[in-house]
Every structure is written in C-alpha cells, then in structure tokens.
From Swiss-Prot:
Keyword annotations of the record: Aminotransferase, Cytoplasm, Glutamine amidotransferase, Transferase
Protein name as it appears in the record: Glutamine--fructose-6-phosphate aminotransferase [isomerizing]
Main location: cytoplasm
Gene designation per UniProt: glmS
Pfam families according to UniProt: SIS (PF01380)
Top-level taxon in the UniProt lineage: Bacteria
Start and end residues of each SIS domain: 4-146
Keyword Ubl conjugation: no
Reaction(s) catalysed by this chain's protein: D-fructose 6-phosphate + L-glutamine = D-glucosamine 6-phosphate + L-glutamate
InterPro entries cross-referenced by the UniProt entry: GlmS/FrlB_SIS, SIS_dom, SIS_dom_sf
Length: 156
C-alpha cells in the first residue's frame, strides 16, 4: 500500500467508487484522504459515475475502485473499463479472484481476503485508511494533527 501511495501523491483530485454497501466506504476513503493529505477527493456510487464524475476522468485523476467479489462486481468492472477507456488510472481493491479477473491494466491493486459482502466494508476500510495515511506521510503532512479539524462538534 505504501508503494502504491506514490502514485496518488502527485494527484490534485482523486475519485473513489463503491457500489452497494461499499459506497459509504468510498465516501469515507475520500474524506480520510482530504482530511490528512489535503488532496481533493470525492466518493461516488459507482452506478452514478456516468452522471457527472466521468467528466473529470483523465490521466491525472486516480480512481480508487472498491470492488469486493460478489453480485455487483461485474458492474463495477464495467465502470473501471470506462475510466480506463478515458485514460484514467485505476487502483483496484478486491479479493484475489476480482484482482485476477480485472486487475490487468490497473495502476495498482490491493488483494483482499474473500469475505461476505455485508462485512466487506469493515474489512476493506483498513487498506482505504492505510492508503490515505501513506499518501499523507509521503506528502509530509502531520497525520496526527490535520489542519483545521476539530475533534468534536459543538451544537449551539
């Protein structure tokens, strides 16, 4: 994951795609990257990619695809292919069979254990957070005290 972070460091923008129960993890991954590395990142539902985010795709915008094996995997692969057809660079986070099926042509892959789709977001959160951490460290930001963040929210 640390070696993969080198590919993300120069980016000004990063997109995270997730489908189904992995969509909130795409949002969380983008939030973590923004908070500690100060790179603009957005999380999107993979099925909504054609409704806006696809216009942002080029060779300078890495796309992190969170795609566990399961019934929605092939649909996410279709999104990955659309990104690659536009010159986008894909980082695939998937189980071994997913990486074998769709990893060719990706900028990088992270191979995860095969788990039930309902617990995949908990398992896949680890590499998503580690990627944000390593990008921030490589950029030289203080990951323990991100700028302008409060530890709590005050309600008035």
């Amino acid at each position: 994951i640390e070696a993969m972070a080198h590919h993300i460091v120069p980016a000004r923008d990063v997109l995270y795609l997730g489908r189904g129960t992995d969509y909130p993890l795409a949002l969380e991954g983008a939030l973590k990257l923004k908070e500690i590395s100060y790179i603009h990142a957005e999380g999107y539902a993979a099925g909504e990619m054609k409704h806006g985010p696809i216009a942002l795709i080029d060779e300078l915008v890495p796309v992190i695809c969170i795609a566990p094996s399961g019934p929605l995997f092939e649909k996410t692969v279709s999104n990955m292919q659309e990104v690659q057809a536009r010159g986008g660079k894909v980082v695939l986070i998937s189980a071994y069979d997913g990486v074998q099926a769709a990893g060719e042509g990706c900028l990088a892959t992270i191979t995860m254990p095969k788990v039930h789709p309902l617990i995949a977001p908990m398992v896949y959160a680890v590499p998503v957070q580690l990627l944000a951490y390593h990008v921030a460290v490589l950029k030289g930001t203080d990951v323990d005290q991100p700028r302008n963040l409060a530890k709590s929210v005050t309600v008035e």
